[in-house]
Amino acid sequence: MIKSWKPQELSISYHQFTVFQKDSTPPVMDWTDEAIEKGYAAADGAISFEAQRNTKAFILFRLNSSETVNSYEKKVTVPFHVTENGIHIESIMSKRLSFDLPKGDYQLTCWTVPAEMSDLHADTYIIDAVSV
Protein backbone atom coordinates (compact mmCIF):
# COMPACT_ATOMS: atom_id res chain seq x y z
CA MET A 1 0.00 0.00 0.00
CA ILE A 2 1.23 3.49 -0.93
CA LYS A 3 -0.42 6.56 0.55
CA SER A 4 0.30 10.22 1.11
CA TRP A 5 -1.78 12.36 3.45
CA LYS A 6 -2.35 16.08 2.89
CA PRO A 7 0.02 18.35 4.84
CA GLN A 8 -1.42 19.18 8.26
CA GLU A 9 -0.52 22.17 10.40
CA LEU A 10 1.03 21.63 13.83
CA SER A 11 2.18 24.23 16.37
CA ILE A 12 5.61 23.11 17.56
CA SER A 13 6.53 23.71 21.20
CA TYR A 14 9.59 22.70 23.21
CA HIS A 15 11.44 21.98 19.94
CA GLN A 16 9.85 18.55 19.51
CA PHE A 17 6.89 16.58 18.22
CA THR A 18 5.94 13.01 19.04
CA VAL A 19 4.69 10.07 16.97
CA PHE A 20 2.79 7.64 19.20
CA GLN A 21 0.19 4.88 19.26
CA LYS A 22 -3.47 5.64 18.56
CA ASP A 23 -5.66 5.86 21.67
CA SER A 24 -2.69 6.41 23.99
CA THR A 25 -0.99 9.31 25.73
CA PRO A 26 2.49 10.32 24.56
CA PRO A 27 5.14 9.54 27.18
CA VAL A 28 7.38 12.19 28.67
CA MET A 29 10.68 11.90 26.81
CA ASP A 30 14.12 11.95 28.39
CA TRP A 31 16.21 14.11 26.07
CA THR A 32 19.69 12.88 27.01
CA ASP A 33 22.80 14.32 25.36
CA GLU A 34 22.84 11.22 23.13
CA ALA A 35 19.19 11.74 22.11
CA ILE A 36 19.86 15.39 21.29
CA GLU A 37 22.85 14.38 19.16
CA LYS A 38 20.75 11.78 17.28
CA GLY A 39 17.79 14.13 16.81
CA TYR A 40 15.19 11.92 18.48
CA ALA A 41 14.17 10.32 21.77
CA ALA A 42 12.25 7.04 22.12
CA ALA A 43 10.12 5.56 24.90
CA ASP A 44 7.09 3.29 25.35
CA GLY A 45 6.06 2.87 21.71
CA ALA A 46 6.67 6.51 20.83
CA ILE A 47 9.30 8.60 19.06
CA SER A 48 9.90 12.32 19.60
CA PHE A 49 11.70 14.09 16.79
CA GLU A 50 13.68 17.27 17.33
CA ALA A 51 12.13 20.36 15.74
CA GLN A 52 14.28 23.27 14.62
CA ARG A 53 11.99 26.04 15.89
CA ASN A 54 8.95 26.60 18.07
CA THR A 55 6.60 27.77 15.34
CA LYS A 56 3.76 26.77 13.08
CA ALA A 57 4.92 23.88 10.93
CA PHE A 58 3.49 21.35 8.52
CA ILE A 59 3.57 17.57 8.90
CA LEU A 60 3.50 15.61 5.65
CA PHE A 61 3.06 11.90 6.33
CA ARG A 62 3.70 9.30 3.61
CA LEU A 63 3.44 5.51 3.55
CA ASN A 64 5.78 3.50 1.29
CA SER A 65 6.34 6.54 -0.92
CA SER A 66 8.97 6.50 -3.66
CA GLU A 67 9.06 10.32 -3.79
CA THR A 68 12.44 11.80 -2.94
CA VAL A 69 13.19 14.78 -0.72
CA ASN A 70 15.74 16.90 -2.55
CA SER A 71 16.24 19.81 -0.14
CA TYR A 72 16.40 19.21 3.59
CA GLU A 73 18.41 20.21 6.64
CA LYS A 74 18.29 16.99 8.63
CA LYS A 75 17.29 13.35 8.15
CA VAL A 76 16.64 10.86 10.97
CA THR A 77 15.58 7.21 10.51
CA VAL A 78 14.25 5.03 13.35
CA PRO A 79 12.38 1.71 13.69
CA PHE A 80 8.75 1.96 14.81
CA HIS A 81 6.07 -0.62 15.60
CA VAL A 82 2.37 0.22 15.26
CA THR A 83 0.49 -1.98 17.74
CA GLU A 84 -3.05 -1.20 16.50
CA ASN A 85 -4.22 0.52 13.34
CA GLY A 86 -3.40 4.21 13.60
CA ILE A 87 -0.97 6.70 15.08
CA HIS A 88 -1.10 10.24 16.43
CA ILE A 89 1.37 13.10 16.11
CA GLU A 90 1.40 16.07 18.45
CA SER A 91 3.63 18.61 20.10
CA ILE A 92 3.29 19.39 23.80
CA MET A 93 0.88 22.32 23.45
CA SER A 94 -0.71 21.47 20.09
CA LYS A 95 -3.70 19.71 18.67
CA ARG A 96 -3.38 16.00 17.91
CA LEU A 97 -3.02 14.85 14.29
CA SER A 98 -4.25 11.35 13.37
CA PHE A 99 -3.09 9.03 10.60
CA ASP A 100 -4.56 5.62 9.76
CA LEU A 101 -1.22 3.80 9.52
CA PRO A 102 -1.86 0.03 9.47
CA LYS A 103 -0.58 -2.20 12.27
CA GLY A 104 2.98 -3.42 11.60
CA ASP A 105 6.71 -2.68 11.63
CA TYR A 106 8.11 0.39 9.90
CA GLN A 107 11.20 2.47 9.37
CA LEU A 108 10.23 6.10 10.02
CA THR A 109 12.36 8.72 8.33
CA CYS A 110 11.82 12.32 9.38
CA TRP A 111 13.09 14.92 6.90
CA THR A 112 13.45 18.44 8.33
CA VAL A 113 12.74 21.01 5.62
CA PRO A 114 13.19 24.63 6.82
CA ALA A 115 10.68 27.27 5.67
CA GLU A 116 13.14 28.78 3.19
CA MET A 117 13.43 25.38 1.41
CA SER A 118 9.76 24.36 1.70
CA ASP A 119 7.10 24.73 -0.98
CA LEU A 120 4.67 25.41 1.89
CA HIS A 121 6.75 28.44 3.07
CA ALA A 122 6.80 27.10 6.64
CA ASP A 123 8.99 24.60 8.46
CA THR A 124 7.93 21.20 7.15
CA TYR A 125 8.56 17.74 8.55
CA ILE A 126 8.14 14.97 6.01
CA ILE A 127 7.70 11.61 7.69
CA ASP A 128 8.14 8.57 5.49
CA ALA A 129 6.90 5.28 6.92
CA VAL A 130 8.29 2.27 5.05
CA SER A 131 6.98 -1.22 5.81
CA VAL A 132 9.68 -3.68 6.90
Swiss-Prot record:
Q: How does it sit in the membrane?
A: Peripheral membrane protein
Which cysteines pair up through disulfides? They are: none
The subcellular location is: Cell membrane
GO CC annotations on file: plasma membrane
**InterPro entries, per database record:** ComJ_sf, Competence_nuclease_inhibitor
Q: Which GO terms describe its biological process?
A: establishment of competence for transformation
Q: This protein's superkingdom?
A: Bacteria
Question: What Pfam families is this protein classified in?
Answer: ComJ
Q: Which UniProt keywords apply?
A: Cell membrane, Competence, Membrane
Q: How does it assemble?
A: This protein is a subunit of a 75 kDa protein complex, which governs binding and entry of donor DNA. The complex is a tetramer of two subunits of the DNA-entry nuclease and two subunits of a competence-specific protein. Only the complex is able to bind ds- and ss-DNA.
What does the protein in this record do? Plays a role in the competence of cells to be transformed. It inhibits the activity of the DNA-entry nuclease.
Name of the protein this chain belongs to: DNA-entry nuclease inhibitor
Organism the protein comes from = Bacillus subtilis (strain 168)
Species classification: Bacteria, Bacillati, Bacillota, Bacilli, Bacillales
